[in-house]
């Protein structure tokens, strides 16, 4: 375990463990993942995707990132989350750093993420957008037709240095 932080970032290859960690974290974030149908879709979706978890000394999951790659050159943050009590402690940045290293190893030129647009005026997602800005993402476009008009989808992108 890193002596500076109280957790390790581990790649999880066990497809039975990925949904356990994902459910545990996503259920701790009802302001972001309150829609049960979407939550279930994410929990099932992580099984076959690259997945990293932040585990503390007792092997408790503090957060996770699951990603996919489109067209061989665009890394996509499929779903991620960090326990509320661990927000602003570097867990998300450490997890994102691992995901970005993976994207670079796979030859990706860009990273992208879909999140709720500021046009929805929903405070929890303001924190989400600030997080993505802090790791180098920029807004690209808001699509009201992607999810629905009440939940406009903001696509954020980050060019990756190869």
Predicted regions span which residues?
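Acetyl-CoA-dependent GNAT
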Residues: 7-78, 83, 96-97, 102, ...
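Short hydrophobic/aromatic beta-strand or adjacent loop that forms the aromatic wall/cage
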Residues: 49, 151-155
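A short, internal acetyl-CoA/4′-phosphopantetheine-binding micro-motif in the GNAT/acyltransferase core
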Residues: 80-88, 116-119
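Residues forming the Rossmann-fold NAD(P)(H) cofactor-binding site
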Residues: 93
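Conserved GNAT acetyl-CoA-binding A-motif
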Residues: 103-124
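Short glycine/proline-centered loop/turn elements that form peptide/ligand docking sites
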Residues: 125-128, 142-152
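Conserved active-site tyrosine of GNAT-family acetyltransferases
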Residues: 132, 137
């Amino acid at each position: 375990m890193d002596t500076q932080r109280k957790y390790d970032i581990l790649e999880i290859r066990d497809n039975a463990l990925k949904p356990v960690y994902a459910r545990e974290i996503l259920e701790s974030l009802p302001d972001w993942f309150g829609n049960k149908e979407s939550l279930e879709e994410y929990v099932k979706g992580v099984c076959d995707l690259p997945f990293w978890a932040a585990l503390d000394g007792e092997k408790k999951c503090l957060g996770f990132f699951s990603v996919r790659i489109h067209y061989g050159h665009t890394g996509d943050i499929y779903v991620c989350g960090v326990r509320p009590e661990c927000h602003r402690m570097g867990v998300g940045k450490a997890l994102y750093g691992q995901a970005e290293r993976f994207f670079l190893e796979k030859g990706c030129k860009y990273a992208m993420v879909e999140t709720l647009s500021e046009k929805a005026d929903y405070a929890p997602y303001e924190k989400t957008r600030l997080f993505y800005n802090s790791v180098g993402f920029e807004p690209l476009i808001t699509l009201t037709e992607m999810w629905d008009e009440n939940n406009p989808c903001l696509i954020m992108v980050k060019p990756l240095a190869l």
